[in-house]
Amino acid sequence: MVTIVWKESKGTAKSRYKARRAELIAERRSNEALARKIALKLSGCVRADKAASLGSLRCKKAEEVERKQNRIYYSKPRSEMGVTCVGRQKIKLGSKPLI
């Protein structure tokens, strides 16, 4: 009697590519985290020092938003300024206002 042994599937090219990318990203993240830790130790900064040194960011005023001056034309017509267009009904011998 013959026994058939199936090999494990290596997966598709896309899954292998994604696995390689995941390994590279994980390695890069660990390297960046280690580099940040080393830089922090070398600089001797603590969170409190960083917060105190960023006083300019705390005192920074919020930017004012520019507002449109012609807003009254687009609001509900309370006066004649609110009417921005006039409609006309065209017929064979002339045009009549829609009012």
UniProtKB/Swiss-Prot annotation:
UniProt KW Transcription regulation keyword: yes
This protein's UniProt keywords: Transcription, Transcription regulation, Transcription termination
Biological processes, Gene Ontology terms: DNA-templated transcription termination
Role this protein plays: N protein regulates the transition from the early to the middle stage of lytic development.
Further comment found in the protein's record: Protein N is an immediate early function essential for all other phage vegetative functions.
Protein's name according to its UniProt entry: Probable regulatory protein N
Organism: Enterobacteria phage phi21
Lineage, top ranks: Viruses, Duplodnaviria, Heunggongvirae, Uroviricota, Caudoviricetes
